[in-house]
Amino acid sequence: RIGSELSCDKRFAPYLLKNSLADCPKLTDIQQKIAHTRIFTGTTTAINSRLHLFNLKHFTLAIIDEASQILEPDLVGILSARHDRSNAIDKFILIGDYKQLPAIAQQEEEEARVDDPLLQSIGLNDCRNSLFERLYKQSKEDFRSILHKQGRMHPAISEFPNQTFYY
């Protein structure tokens, strides 16, 4: 886990990157430990503050949960990360629901409006919208999927938002 002990449950503290590397006295030991670790977790903020990790490891997949709440500036470092001379991450899966939990922005509509025609041509019309929302609205059905079963609430309760907002 990449992050701080302050925001980590004590049960998971041994898995914090800092703690898991404590038994690595040499740089080569650190490199090997990172190279052999299959899964890394952390917030976008925590990972963006440690982009040097991508100098040590290439990833085949990054899953970004709650992506509908994350503005592009918070993702750009991860999306553009490099390993050697290629992309540090081969594939991204963005998970979220912009209708339920939109991006968090404090800008007013007028401040966030994009007037540049080139940016508008790629769907960037409002800086308060997440990359997830923009990609979702511009993508073809083949490139996205919708959750068909959820376990958080009784089906009768979930029927209202499903019919009102999604179908």
Please report, for each region that a protein language model flagged, where it lies by residue.
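Conserved helicase motor core of SF1/SF2 NTP-dependent helicases
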Residues: 1, 31, 45-47, 53-167
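ASCE P-loop NTPase motor cores of helicases and related translocases
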Residues: 1-40, 162, 166
